[in-house]
């Protein structure tokens, strides 16, 4: 799962651009450049241009994610969810996914909606209603950005929800405010 996402982002952003050599990337990443850290995560995660090393990918994603780099947070969340490069940890996966989702990443929003949906159908008693509302909210937000399958997932959620729950989900989506990312290049 992570490797496909890594390869996607690598092709989208880095494959067409001239690649800085590994030494220059490490230098910039070591100085705290979140984009360089994210780029190293992609390079190590995909094995494109470097030997594939998921532990190194996770290390560099965490460095960038700690600076609120949205895509690094998303990829780190995927790594924790799948246990690739880091020990599998659903709590950490959810934490990093939420951070990316709160910055407006539609993929993270959809993923978070899916995570809440799983709780709504098989979670502890009492958590189902809150999980349904949160799943609906995150699917709705991802659908508003045109993210594939989100609109259908949002609509499917309504079949198991009361009107009040749907209204609450709509209210939460309407009052959602993005978290501002930190740009490491502004320092």
Where are these regions (language model features)?
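Terminal, low-structured helical/coil segments at or just beyond the last alpha-helical repeat
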Residues: 2-17, 149-187
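N-terminal segments that cap or nucleate solenoid repeat domains
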Residues: 2-46
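Short helix-capping/linker turns of helical repeat alpha-solenoids
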Residues: 30-33, 46-48, 53, 66-70, ...
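TPR/TPR-like alpha-solenoid signature
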Residues: 38, 74, 95, 110, ...
């Amino acid at each position: 799962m992570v490797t496909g996402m890594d390869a996607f982002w690598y092709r989208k952003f880095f494959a067409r651009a001239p690649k800085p050599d590994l030494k220059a990337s490490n230098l910039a990443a070591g100085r705290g450049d979140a984009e360089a850290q994210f780029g190293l995560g992609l390079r190590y995660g995909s094995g494109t241009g470097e030997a594939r090393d998921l532990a190194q990918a996770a290390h560099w994603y965490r460095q960038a994610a700690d600076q609120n780099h949205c895509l690094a947070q998303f990829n780190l969340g995927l790594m924790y969810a799948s246990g690739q490069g880091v020990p599998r940890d659903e709590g950490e996966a959810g934490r990093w996914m939420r951070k990316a989702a709160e910055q407006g990443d539609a993929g993270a929003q959809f993923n978070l909606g899916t995570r809440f949906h799983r709780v709504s159908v098989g979670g502890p008693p009492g958590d189902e209603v809150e999980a349904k509302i949160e799943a609906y909210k995150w699917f709705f937000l991802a659908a508003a950005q045109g993210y594939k399958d989100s609109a259908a997932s949002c609509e499917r959620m309504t079949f198991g929800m009361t009107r009040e729950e749907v209204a609450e989900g709509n209210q939460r989506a309407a009052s959602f405010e993005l978290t501002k990312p930190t740009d490491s290049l502004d320092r």
